[in-house]
């Protein structure tokens, strides 16, 4: 999840602070998601997926411990 979130953010040309503002959270929180120190709660996962226009599983696959 951390790498996928950062890749999506960078592809969209956003800083952590800009993404945090768009999602209604803090830059510190976005940083903790990207480094793997924290995982967003399910409602925020959906908000992030909607923001980037992707499915939750595409970003948070590892957070759910899914196996393909």
Which residues fall in each region the model found?
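Short, low-complexity interaction segments enriched in Ser/Thr/Pro/Gly
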Residues: 1-3, 18, 25, 53
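Residues in the recognition helix of alpha-helical DNA-binding motifs
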Residues: 8, 22, 33, 62
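DNA major-groove recognition helix of helix-turn-helix/homeodomain DNA-binding modules
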Residues: 24, 43-58
